[in-house]
C-alpha cells in the first residue's frame, strides 16, 4: 500500500481502503499502535472526529465540512438524513451500481460529462439524484463502462449485491432510483450514534 494511504490507516488504526491490502509490516505496525491506544483513554471529541474521518474516507475523501454542513441543515434525524443525503449523490450511486470501482473514478467520469441523468449531461459529482431519475451512460463511453464492469466482476473487486433502492440493467447500462435508501452497509465498524 502507498505511504500516503497507509498514513491514513495509521491515524484510524484500521484498513479503510477496501480495494488495497496491507503488507505484513504494515499490519504489524497497526496492531502495535492498537495495543498502545488501548492503554490511553480517548475523549468523546476524538472518538467522534475519528468516526467522521472514517465516514469521509468511506465516501472517497468527501470534505468533512460538507458533511457537517449537511448535518446542520436537518433537524429531525440528523445522522440518518446526513447519510441518506450522501447516498443520493451521483458519484456514490455510480459506485453502488458497480459502474465504477472507486469514488475517485466516478467523480472523474462525471466531470468529463460521461453520465446523464434523465438524458441530460451532468458534470457535478455531488448532484442529488431524486426518486424516479434515470441514470444512463453517454453513447461514446459505453464500451469503457462495459469493459470496466466485466473486469471488476472477474476480479471480484465489486460486490455482487446491489442496494435495493436501485434498479439497474447491465446490458443497456441504465439505472433508476426507486426510493430513498433504507439501510447502508459499511465495510468496517462505524458507530453512527456518535454523529448526533
Swiss-Prot record:
Taxonomic classification: Eukaryota, Viridiplantae, Streptophyta, Embryophyta, Marchantiophyta
A GO CC term assigned to this protein in UniProt: mitochondrion
GO molecular function: rRNA binding; structural constituent of ribosome
SMART domains for the chain: S4 (SM00363)
InterPro entries from the UniProt entry: Ribosomal_uS4, Ribosomal_uS4_bac-type, Ribosomal_uS4_CS, S4_RNA-bd, S4_RNA-bd_sf
Gene that produces this protein: RPS4
Assigned keywords, A-Z: Mitochondrion, Ribonucleoprotein, Ribosomal protein, RNA-binding, rRNA-binding
The species this protein was found in: Marchantia polymorpha (Common liverwort)
Protein name (database record): Small ribosomal subunit protein uS4m
Family membership noted in the UniProt record: Belongs to the universal ribosomal protein uS4 family.
Amino acid at each position: 500500500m502507498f505511504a500516503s494511504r497507509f498514513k491514513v490507516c495509521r491515524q484510524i488504526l484500521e484498513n479503510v481502503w477496501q480495494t488495497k491490502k496491507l503488507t505484513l509490516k504494515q499490519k504489524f505496525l497497526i496492531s502495535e499502535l492498537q495495543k498502545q491506544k488501548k492503554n490511553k483513554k480517548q475523549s468523546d471529541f476524538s472518538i467522534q472526529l475519528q468516526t467522521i474521518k472514517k465516514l469521509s474516507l468511506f465516501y472517497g475523501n468527501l470534505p468533512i465540512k460538507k458533511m457537517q454542513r449537511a448535518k446542520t441543515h436537518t433537524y429531525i434525524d440528523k445522522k440518518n438524513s446526513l447519510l441518506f443525503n450522501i447516498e443520493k449523490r451521483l458519484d456514490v450511486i455510480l459506485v453502488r451500481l458497480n459502474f465504477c470501482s472507486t469514488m475517485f473514478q466516478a467523480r472523474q467520469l462525471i466531470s468529463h460529462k460521461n453520465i446523464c441523468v434523465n438524458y441530460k449531461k451532468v458534470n457535478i459529482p455531488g448532484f442529488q439524484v431524486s426518486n424516479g431519475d434515470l441514470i444512463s451512460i453517454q453513447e461514446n463511453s459505453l464500451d469503457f463502462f462495459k469493459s470496466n464492469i466485466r473486469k471488476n466482476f472477474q476480479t471480484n473487486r465489486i460486490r455482487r449485491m446491489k442496494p435495493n433502492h436501485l434498479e439497474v440493467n447491465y446490458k443497456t447500462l441504465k439505472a433508476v432510483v426507486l426510493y430513498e435508501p433504507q439501510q447502508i452497509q459499511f465495510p468496517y465498524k462505524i458507530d453512527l450514534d456518535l454523529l448526533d
